[in-house]
From Swiss-Prot:
Keyword Secreted: yes
Composition bias type Basic and acidic residues, residue spans: 77-94
Expression (tissue specificity): Expressed in heart atrium and to a lower extent in heart ventricle, but not in brain.
Function: Hormone playing a key role in cardiovascular homeostasis through regulation of natriuresis, diuresis, and vasodilation. Has a cGMP-stimulating activity.
Compartmental location: Secreted
Keyword Secreted: yes
Signal sequence interval, chain numbering: 1-23
Protein name: Natriuretic peptides A
Gene name of this polypeptide: nppa
Matching InterPro entries: Natr_peptide, Natr_peptide_CS, Natriuretic_peptide, Natriuretic_peptide_brain
Molecular-function GO term, any one: hormone activity
């Protein structure tokens, strides 16, 4: 019974000691004045950021929609390019993607060699056998 009382008292003492240590402002890494200054600085920064964000959104909209201001005269370079290559000659991005994917598909489906597999083993074994003349399709040298 005495042992339980000592253990409970010791645990209670450690808990109270930890709570009191945390409550003491001396153990805080920052003073309340520093925290107040930091808070006001953060509020000012958020206000400035909010004002700048409104201006940036308008600029982004203006850049994204140049047609809203009206048709602009193109540079001589652009006009020369349009005269040489009309817009109908340009391929759409999807057409380029489809041609690339069909080329890749053809490459994957193409046989590795025109001779083909002998059917005895897999193509890898046939290649090893043809190099060592010990496979199904290899000729024996005697």
């Amino acid at each position: 019974m005495m042992l339980k009382t000592v253990i409970y008292t010791g645990v209670l003492f450690l808990i109270c000691n930890k709570v009191l240590v945390r409550a003491d402002p001396l153990y805080s890494p920052y003073s309340s004045k520093d925290l107040a200054n930091l808070k006001t600085l953060l509020e000012r920064f958020e206000d400035t950021l909010g004002q700048d964000e409104g201006n940036d959104n308008q600029q982004d909209y203006d850049i994204a929609n140049p047609e809203a201001e009206g048709p602009q005269a193109g540079s001589p370079w652009d006009r020369e390019r349009e005269r040489q290559w009309p817009a109908s000659d340009y391929k759409k991005p999807q057409e380029g993607y489809q041609s690339q994917s069909s080329r890749l598909r053809d490459l994957l489906m193409a046989p590795r060699n025109n001779r083909g597999s002998s059917g005895c083993f897999g193509s890898r074994i046939d290649r090893i056998g043809s190099m060592s003349s010990m496979g199904c399709g290899g000729s024996r040298k005697g």
